[in-house]
């Protein structure tokens, strides 16, 4: 029998992109009827600025508009994540560098850009929408749905 999969999404502060990725991915898993394939779907940040906080209101707004809800509270990446997760997906190149900088030697986690699962013509980098307007959050949502669907196809 195939081992269940643990997936972690990582951005900078864990209030915009990664909690959206977690919620979108969970939704896509449910829509595909693949819940039994996953033990853990979570998100965190490389920084600790927002630990314990709910996602940015604009993240919650985009999720709600698309019928997705989350109860996520921000947390920081920890060394235990590298042994507890099969995939650690970074939202951008800076996140990826920061994750790899603290990755313990011998880690079992596959660390990569979530955007490696982008469809042709879709940017692999999920830009941080924090300092922009609501449009950036909508753009993130579109990318994250695309990446999620393609990742799920890749493991089917």
Swiss-Prot record:
Broad class of the protein's primary localization: cytoplasm
Keyword Cytoplasm on entry: yes
UniProtKB keywords: Cytoplasm, Hydrolase, Protein phosphatase
Compartment list: Cytoplasm
MF (Gene Ontology): acid phosphatase activity; non-membrane spanning protein tyrosine phosphatase activity; protein tyrosine phosphatase activity
Positions annotated as active site in the UniProt record: 11 (nucleophile), 17, 128 (proton donor)
A single Gene Ontology CC term: nucleus
The EC number(s) this enzyme carries: 3.1.3.48, 3.1.3.2
Biological process, per Gene Ontology: signaling
Superkingdom of source: Eukaryota
Catalytic activity: O-phospho-L-tyrosyl-[protein] + H2O = L-tyrosyl-[protein] + phosphate; a phosphate monoester + H2O = an alcohol + phosphate
InterPro entries tied to this protein: LMW_PTPase (IPR050438), Ptyr_pPase (IPR023485), Ptyr_pPase_sf (IPR036196), Tyr_Pase_low_mol_wt_mml (IPR002115), Tyr_phospatase_low_mol_wt (IPR017867)
UniProt record similarity statement: Belongs to the low molecular weight phosphotyrosine protein phosphatase family.
Function in brief: May contribute to dephosphorylation of 'Tyr-15' of cdc2.
Protein known as: Low molecular weight phosphotyrosine protein phosphatase
